[in-house]
């Protein structure tokens, strides 16, 4: 992540921070946090730093994998189980601990989170320009290298799968396998075996 570019794009926003409430499925969340959390978690970007708030279940992994400056868990805010109200109380406390009284959220951010934070005195504005997406669109040299490495690995995996399938025979009448089944080394060539070759 290019923090200088991010700061430049967020500089004209009035709020104290930029907040995401999403899982790894959200490209902005993955980009900003560097964490592949399957369940939604909070990422706050404020004063040039990235702060995460994750469940206790994901805490250890987030500490080692995330690119955040700080990682905190729900239990740090006396929340482990509870409903929406308690969860949002925790969110507001997390923001205030970081000196944040106002946030900008992306246009696809959860309205439930935004409304509940407003009820707790946190100002929430929607970043209708989706600035984080614009930052993600321009890759750093390191990101370009990572994309290139991933592409090379994917191409090698596909070549291996193609070779496995190309080297297979088709079962005929009288073979141990049903006619028309692909065989490799005398055994049916299953999707699981192809997947193993790819991985």
Regions found by a protein language model. Give the residues of each.
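Flexible, acidic/His-enriched mid-domain "rim/lid" segments that flank
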Residues: 92-199
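N-terminal accessory/capping or targeting/presequence segment of soluble
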Residues: 1-94, 139
């Amino acid at each position: 992540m290019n923090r200088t570019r991010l700061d430049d794009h967020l500089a004209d926003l009035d709020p104290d921070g930029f907040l995401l409430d999403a899982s790894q499925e959200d490209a902005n969340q993955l980009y900003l946090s560097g964490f592949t959390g399957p369940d939604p978690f909070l990422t706050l970007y404020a004063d040039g730093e990235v702060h995460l708030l994750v469940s206790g279940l994901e805490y250890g992994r987030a500490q080692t994998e995330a690119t955040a400056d700080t990682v905190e868990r729900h239990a740090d805010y006396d929340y482990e189980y509870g409903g929406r109200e308690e969860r949002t109380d925790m969110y507001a406390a997390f923001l205030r601990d970081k000196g944040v009284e106002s946030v900008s959220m992306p246009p696809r951010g959860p309205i439930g989170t935004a409304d509940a934070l407003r009820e707790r005195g946190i100002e929430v504005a929607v970043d209708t320009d989706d600035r984080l997406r614009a930052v993600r669109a321009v890759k750093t040299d390191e990101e370009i290298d990572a994309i290139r490495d991933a592409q090379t690995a994917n191409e090698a995996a596909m070549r291996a799968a193609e070779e496995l399938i190309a080297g297979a025979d088709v079962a005929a009448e009288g073979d141990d396998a049903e006619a028309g089944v692909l065989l490799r080394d005398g055994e049916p060539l299953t999707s699981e075996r192809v997947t193993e070759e790819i991985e």
